Amino acid sequence: MLSLSQSLDAQLRAAMQRAFPEADAGLDPQLASASKQEFGDFQANGALPLAKPLKQAPRQIATAIVEQLQADPAFTDLCLEPQIAGPGFINLTIRPERLAAEVSARLGDERLGVPAVSNAAPVVVDFSSPNIAKEMHVGHLRSTIIGDSLARVLEFRGHPVLRLNHVGDWGTQFGMLITHLKQVAPEALDTADAVDLGDLVAFYREAKKRFDDDEAFQSTSRDEVVKLQGGDPVSLKAWGLLCDQSRREFQKIYDRLDILLSERGESFYNPFLPAVIDGLKAAELLVTDDGAQCVFLEGVQGKDGKPLPVIVQKSDGGFNYATTDLAAIRYRFGAAPEGDGARRVVYVTDAGQANHFAGVFQVAERAGWIPDGARLEHVPFGLVQGEDGKKLKTRAGDTVRLRDLLDEAVERAETDLRSRLKEEERSESEEFIQHVAGTVGLAAVKYADLSQNRITNYQFSFDRMLALQGNTAPYLLYAVVRIAGIARKGGDLAATNAQLQFSEPQEWALVRELLKFDAVIAEVEEELLPNRLCSYLFELSQVFNRFYDQVPVLKADPEALASRLALCRLTADTLRLGLGLLGIATLDRM
């Protein structure tokens, strides 16, 4: 079933084609939800860009499009007469009876009117990607939950999604860590969990300091890397133990956040690195510069005005991150079974890596490794800052461990809940308190991040994110709880066969907000901005609360009761589904 916006878009395109058959290209209605209620339900702005090629005034073009729309019975059955506004905007208002019918249809539809795409294609989402032998910190939070949310939306739209965790499990750091552990904690290289991950992180710091300060240690560490790369069984066993230990600790965080990932670390691509060099050589892109193999970028210059290089093989013959990323791109777009067969590859990393990926993407494009019509995208995000506007740190100045941050969020949510229960003189079981605090705490952390435009930095504040008012997870969760309370008070939210009738302005406002859901999901799929979904859910919660506060529901007249209960149910279903796509669980009681 086509959604309202899809039906309108198709009707507008057909009308534009009939009105201007000579303009066979560029006929895009530019359909969007109306910015204000007085403009109707949708606005079509496609007349404006046609003015120049057609050499006509935009209002004249809009008039011709409207004439064709009015001659289409399917359109007149869906919409009232269009209005032309401003320089040539076409304002469209859906007929009230069609809006009511759409609400009825969504009540019986688990997808709530969001159609699966007709052109589903495999997508790779690369996110989280912590480093072995290091604990996950607050910087991993954004990549992990943004990537998870985008994967959920793409999956919901019908795309097969491969969620990849490109962990840092290879490189010089293992040479220095293994060398150091052989001397100070050899048991860690022979026995699983001989030291915990926190100790391993401390050992890593010690090894890094020795590597920076001691040339002999540097040399021994590099020899260890060579042994590891050469398949030395002792080195490989030590490496495997370190990876397994980190992997188990990472999984505890992923389980807690309800994150699904398939690990495919940097080491996976080692066998494919020589082929990257061969492929670039065959494409005549390689240039030797100071003994290193490089590809010089087009249109990107350094301060000296010369093209910047992407180094793919160092002068000592070693490979680097760029080589691994190029091998990963080749594999991800490569045809199965030798590759993933993806048509869209999305990298979710901090904005500091934007230049790196821009360079790697350009090299892959010029080498011919991105299939025609495929999409390769970097999804950058800003820093998590403290309330002082600086990078979030502990009081001791260290990076905040992710598990500590999650623990504190849940503890604060529990403190708030116990305080509220005391004020309300409510008695709840310990199981209830722990469940609600855990759900609210993690929801607050996720939503506070996802509700920000990911491109910008944001200031982390437990007080703000746990507030029951404002654009917060608790506010949205409370809207769901409010509706669940209607059912507990005797409202039958399960009935779907009632003839829906709406008369109050608050009802129509809620209807119109509910019917925007499909367009918002399509927008998030295309633009990869989860905050658009957050903004919509917040606005929906506000519109619902105004409706619920101003219009009687359980005490409504019998002829209005079923319709108002239907609105409550669809609101709850939309909030649950929308929050679920953000990776946030809901509650029936708080």
From Swiss-Prot:
Annotated Gene3D superfamilies: Arginyl tRNA synthetase N-terminal domain, HUPs, Isoleucyl-tRNA Synthetase, Domain 1
Motif stretch ('HIGH' region): 130-140
EC number in record: 6.1.1.19
Major subcellular site: cytoplasm
Top-rank EC class of the record's enzyme: ligase
GO CC field: cytoplasm
Family matches, as SMART domains: Arg_tRNA_synt_N, DALR_1
Record's catalysed reaction(s): tRNA(Arg) + L-arginine + ATP = L-arginyl-tRNA(Arg) + AMP + diphosphate
HAMAP family noted in UniProt: Arg_tRNA_synth
Similarity field: Belongs to the class-I aminoacyl-tRNA synthetase family.
Name listed for the protein in its UniProt record: Arginine--tRNA ligase
Organism: Synechococcus sp. (strain CC9605)
